[in-house]
Amino acid sequence: MAFATLFDSLYCPEEHLDLFHDTAADDDLHLDLHLHQPPPPPPLLDDDLPALFHALRGKEDPLRPAADDDGYGGVSAREAAVGWALRAVARLGFSALTAALAVAYLDRCFLGGALRLGDRPWMARLAAVACVALAAKVEETRVPVLLDLQLCAAERADPNEAYVFEDKTVRRMELLVLSALGWRMHPVTPLSYLQPLLGTAHAARLHHCDTALLALMPDWRWPRHRPSAWAAAALLATAGWCGGGGGDDAELLALIDAPKDEMAECAKIISEEAAAAAAGGIVIGGENKRKGAAGLYSAPASPSGVIGASACFSCDSSSSSVDSLFAALEPPGRPIKRGAAAATTADPLPADEESRDAWPPYAA
């Protein structure tokens, strides 16, 4: 008898198939079970926030490389890479935290010196694909395949969007990104402060803060300031939109405890962007805010690991080699267009083109 009780939890109650079954007893049973369910975990108490934010501030490391030490190779290159990542996150319906993580991964790789574009400007796009994929694996519950991720973010009107990277190529870049990050996948972002601070009780204001911050991520000044400064500046910027202000905002800013001068600089940047967006009839964080960002950065010749978007659906494309991704570039030319890829069959790469000499060094 005692042995049978060990397996009672493994059996599910069967539904009654007779038409004359009385469901009142079942309703009472379900109500009783509902009343005896364990309560949900309590929200983060205010007493825990100072210790949490103190730990977050200790992990902050703003990236301030010199002008000649920018791994992106220019402001427009970063704007294009970050703009593509944000567009992919928005079209796939990912959260704002996923976008913040992807941008943090990108900046850590390029501004930290682990990756450099050099004569391979297509590497920024490849890194953006890998960073979005990694951020989605960390934060999202449903992650699309790499092909769908790239095609969903492609702009059909842009000729430079008419190619995608093979899965093996993206996975190799993911390993490079993980190595550059030291396998630390949860860097501090402004949302690390805003989400526990506002939570579900102030969901509308949190949404406004997310929107304002997402619109500023492609800006070259974004990685130059601490996440706590951006979080505090977002609270200041959204005080008028959501009816905040007064003593409540003062307490919130005191909890974040960002440097005053840096917070004022970030607030100034947000106000400038808001004024520029209002003058152009664009809402901050809207779809058209950075619509032309990707067009500022035109990629030259395609690497060997890039294939036409139409050729992705061909059986022949799966047999092409991708181990020569960072080998010598092909002669200058245009990437394979969507229309031309269907009518053109690319010659398979020779087997001896598997060289890793041109791979960027791993971060120490």
Swiss-Prot record:
Pfam family, one: Cyclin_N
InterPro entries reported in the protein's UniProt record: Cyclin, Cyclin-like_dom, Cyclin-like_sf, Cyclin_N
Residue ranges with Low complexity bias: 340-349
GO cellular component: cyclin-dependent protein kinase holoenzyme complex; cytoplasm; nucleus
GO MF annotation: an example: cyclin-dependent protein serine/threonine kinase regulator activity
Protein's UniProt keywords contain Transit peptide: no
Keywords tagged on the record: Cell cycle, Cell division, Cyclin
GO biological-process terms attached to the record: cell division; G1/S transition of mitotic cell cycle
Region: Disordered, residue numbers: 331-364
Keyword Plastid on entry: no
Family: Belongs to the cyclin family. Cyclin D subfamily.
PANTHER family, per the entry: CYCLINS
Protein name: Cyclin-D3-2
